[in-house]
């Protein structure tokens, strides 16, 4: 008689015990939250390493560029929340519908008013990259609403994860009010604990009645969402290269080529600040050079070329 005790199905106890962890791991990997986490890791890493995101996290952001990014977010969330409202009763999405806790459009409108004024809608338009993202969201909401999960997951979970960090970076780099004007997007007033809410949201995702094929399609759609975001970042990088860095209001005074040279930031950085005689202010040199008519003509031609390229890019 065998020393191993067999079960009624003919599987001995040792084999049954060895299969238990495998079954548990398979169940875990079948969870939509785990599939999304693993299936979008590469795209997530690439998005985090785009130049725009790296510059933002370093506080190297111009206000005009931040305004363009806020505009892109406004159009993106307007589309996403319109489609979420449309599908709030759809069984594949209804358990993830939390307008009070998550919706960002109202907060973004406040930010747009702060940056552009009351007539902000007359001043902004959806960029080419953002429009592609918006079009995709509308298509999904109207034709494949089960895939809305991918876009909600990509946007809201990311906002809850890094929102407070980005808010502080923006406030510090752009000298925005600590009272929240201009950064309402990052404030989730009705979420007391972001980590707990994310866990709750993931549990709701995992409870959705979806087959494995649909889950795989959601992962694929989430990767598309990351790609659309990266296209917007790339567009912002291009726009940023055309914008002059905004001078902070409390920065060092700029020497105008006249008067006390010690007001020049270049001079202030020199180790031998006690002697004026040997100092050469680059601002003075630049002003003198640009006063030459021939170089003024070259500069004007260069500006015209850049303007022409910009016009072509935005056509």
Curated annotation (Swiss-Prot):
Heme b binds at residues 44, 153, 198, 202. Pfam families: Heme_oxygenase. It catalyses: heme b + 3 reduced [NADPH--hemoprotein reductase] + 3 O2 = biliverdin IXalpha + CO + Fe(2+) + 3 oxidized [NADPH--hemoprotein reductase] + 3 H2O + H(+). Residues 2-294 are cytoplasmic. Keywords: Acetylation, Endoplasmic reticulum, Heme, Iron, Membrane, Metal-binding, Microsome, Oxidoreductase, Phosphoprotein, Repeat, S-nitrosylation, Transmembrane, Transmembrane helix. PROSITE patterns: HEME_OXYGENASE. The modification Phosphoserine is found at residue 2. Residues 1-12 have a biased composition (Acidic residues). Residues 13-28 have a biased composition (Basic and acidic residues). Residues 1-28 are annotated as: Disordered. The chain crosses the membrane at residues 295-315. Ubiquitous. GO terms for molecular function: heme oxygenase (decyclizing) activity; metal ion binding. The modification N-acetylserine is found at residue 2. GO terms for cellular component: endoplasmic reticulum membrane; plasma membrane. GO terms for biological process: cellular response to iron ion starvation; heme oxidation; response to hypoxia. It is a single-pass type IV membrane protein. A soluble form arises by proteolytic removal of the membrane anchor. The record marks 159 as: Important for catalytic activity. It is found in: Microsome membrane; Endoplasmic reticulum membrane. It is an enzyme of class 1 (oxidoreductase). HRM repeats lie at residues 263-268, 280-285. The modification S-nitrosocysteine is found at residues 264, 281. Belongs to the heme oxygenase family. PANTHER family: HEME OXYGENASE (PTHR10720), HEME OXYGENASE 2 (PTHR10720:SF2). This is Heme oxygenase 2. It comes from Mus musculus (Mouse). The gene is Hmox2.
